[in-house]
C-alpha cells in the first residue's frame, strides 16, 4: 500500500486521465481468525490479534487487510453507556412516544446524531455524528457483556478512521508488516431487505477507487464509475463474521491489491449537494 497523502479530488473538474489503474485479483482469500475472546474496555487489541494469528496458523504479510468488527473496537475504547445514567430531555420524551422507545435511549440517539431522516414506531433513521445514515445512530446492545444487557448501550467509536489508523500503526510496530485496516459495521439499506457490512473506518487502502478514464471491454471511456472498495471488502468479511453468536470479529483478507493511496472511510460519504433523497 502506498503511504497516505490525503483524499483525492473527486470532482468532475479533475482530469479524467488522472486515475489509478487497478490490478484485479483472480482470487481473494478470507480467513476468520480464531480464538478471539469477548473484548472488554481497555483490552489490548494488538495482543488479541497476535494470539488469534498464532492460533489460526497464519502469518501477517505486507498487503494483507484485517477487517475488524466495530463492536470490539467500541468495547476496547469503552464506548459504553448505562441507560440509568441518562437523563432524557423534553424533546427525547416527546419523540420517544412517537417511536415507542425508551426516552433514555432516544436521548442517546439524539446526542449521537446530526439530524433525523425518518422515524416510525421502533426505529429512528438518522445521520449520525460520523455522517453515516443509520438506524438508531448505530447504537446497539447485542453481544454486550453486562449483568443487564438491555441497560447497556454500545456506541460507535468517536473516530473510526483514527481507530483504524492506530491499529494499523500498532500492527506495523508489532509485526513489521504494512497491512490495511477496515472497521466494519452492519447496516440496513433503504430499498433492500437485510443488513450488510459497511466500512466505517479505513486505513491503508482506498475507500473508493475512481475508474473514470478507464476503458470498458469495447474501448469506451468510463465517465462516472467509482467503486466502493472499502464497502465491498467490508461486506465480504461480514459473511464470515456473522450477525449473532458466531464470535468471529476479525477477518484476514489476502489477495487484494491497489496502487491507489489510502483514504479514510469518510471519503465515501456523498456530499450534501449530490444527495438526491434528502
Predicted features by range, described:
Residues 3-20:
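Short, small-residue-biased leader/transition segments that mark boundaries at the very start
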Residues 1-3, 64:
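Helix-centric, low-specificity signal for extended rod-like, repetitive segments
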Residues 2, 11, 162, 166:
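Short, conserved clusters of charged catalytic residues that mark active-site
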Residues 24-278:
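N-terminal and secondary-structure boundary signal
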Amino acid at each position: 500500500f502506498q503511504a497516505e497523502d490525503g483524499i483525492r479530488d473527486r470532482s468532475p473538474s479533475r482530469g479524467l486521465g488522472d486515475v489509478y489503474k487497478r490490478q484485479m485479483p483472480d482470487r481473494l482469500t478470507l480467513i476468520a481468525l480464531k480464538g478471539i475472546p469477548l473484548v472488554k474496555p481497555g483490552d489490548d487489541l494488538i495482543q488479541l490479534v497476535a494470539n488469534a494469528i498464532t492460533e489460526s496458523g497464519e502469518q501477517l504479510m505486507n498487503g494483507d487487510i484485517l477487517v475488524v468488527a466495530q463492536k470490539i473496537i467500541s468495547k476496547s475504547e469503552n464506548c459504553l453507556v448505562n441507560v440509568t445514567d441518562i437523563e432524557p430531555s423534553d424533546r427525547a420524551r416527546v419523540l420517544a412516544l412517537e417511536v415507542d422507545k425508551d426516552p433514555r435511549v432516544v436521548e442517546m440517539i439524539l446526542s449521537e446524531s446530526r439530524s433525523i431522516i425518518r422515524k416510525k414506531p421502533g426505529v429512528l433513521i438518522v445521520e449520525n455524528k460520523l455522517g453515516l445514515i443509520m438506524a438508531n445512530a448505530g447504537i446497539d446492545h447485542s453481544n454486550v457483556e453486562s449483568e443487564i444487557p438491555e441497560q447497556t448501550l454500545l456506541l460507535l467509536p468517536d473516530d473510526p478512521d483514527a481507530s483504524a489508523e492506530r491499529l494499523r500503526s500498532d500492527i506495523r510496530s508489532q509485526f513489521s508488516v504494512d497491512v490495511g485496516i477496515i472497521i466494519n459495521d452492519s447496516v440496513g439499506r433503504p430499498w433492500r431487505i437485510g443488513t450488510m457490512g459497511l466500512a466505517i473506518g479505513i486505513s491503508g487502502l482506498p475507500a473508493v477507487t475512481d475508474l473514470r478514464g478507464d476503458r470498458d471491454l469495447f474501448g469506451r471511456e468510463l465517465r462516472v464509475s467509482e467503486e466502493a472498495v472499502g464497502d465491498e471488502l467490508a461486506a465480504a468479511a461480514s459473511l464470515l463474521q456473522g450477525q449473532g453468536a458466531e464470535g468471529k470479529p476479525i477477518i484476514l483478507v489476502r489477495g487484494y491489491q491497489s496502487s491507489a493511496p489510502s483514504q479514510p472511510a469518510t471519503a465515501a460519504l456523498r456530499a450534501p449537494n449530490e444527495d438526491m433523497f434528502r
